[in-house]
Amino acid sequence: MEQMKITNLTDEQISFQLILHSGNARSCIIQSLRAYKEGKKDEADALIAKAEQDLSAAHDIHFQMIQKESGGEATAFSLLLMHAEDHLMSTLSMKELVKEMLDLFKTKNI
């Protein structure tokens, strides 16, 4: 996935990009668990990989925001940005939990 540059985006557009990528990742993570339940283990792994790509894109955007602010360009606080960051962090936590669950299921042949 090509890295998106945030230099020409508004703060709202940046927030929506974070929400978009973390939302896509969250959907893939949930679909992965459902695929595994249906016995589609390869599909489950592919969905986790897709989720990781979206999370990587979101992380890149977030990192650019941090770099921008550390360079002296302040980021305005907004409820939308707070929601976007919450969405990203909860999706990262969900991914780690589901990956651990899938590893456990595989280890126990469930």
Curated annotation (Swiss-Prot):
Q: Where in the cell is it found?
A: Cytoplasm
- Domain PTS EIIA type-3, first and last residues per copy: 9-107
Q: Which PROSITE patterns match?
A: PTS_EIIA_TYPE_3
One GO biological process term is: polysaccharide transport
Q: Which organism is it from?
A: Bacillus subtilis (strain 168)
* Key word Nuclease present: no
SUPFAM superfamilies for the chain = Enzyme IIa from lactose specific PTS, IIa-lac (SSF46973)
Q: Which InterPro entries match?
A: PTS_IIA_lac/cel (IPR003188), PTS_IIA_lac/cel_sf (IPR036542)
Q: Which GO terms describe its cellular component?
A: cytoplasm
Which Pfam families does the UniProt entry name for this protein?
PTS_IIA
Task: Give residue numbers for the modification (Phosphohistidine).
Answer: 83
State the active site. Answer: 83 (tele-phosphohistidine intermediate)
Protein name, UniProt field: PTS system oligo-beta-mannoside-specific EIIA component
For this UniProt entry, what is the primary localization, expressed as one broad class? cytoplasm
UniProt keyword ATP-binding, yes or no: no
Q: What induces it?
A: Up-regulated by konjac glucomannan and by cellobiose and mannobiose, the possible degradation products of glucomannan. Repressed by glucose via the carbon catabolite repression system. Also repressed by GmuR.
Tell me which domain of life the UniProt entry assigns to the organism this sequence originates from: Bacteria
Protein keywords = Cytoplasm, Kinase, Phosphoprotein, Phosphotransferase system, Polysaccharide transport, Sugar transport, Transferase, Transport
Query: Any idea which GO molecular function terms this record carries?
Result: kinase activity; protein-phosphocysteine-sugar phosphotransferase activity
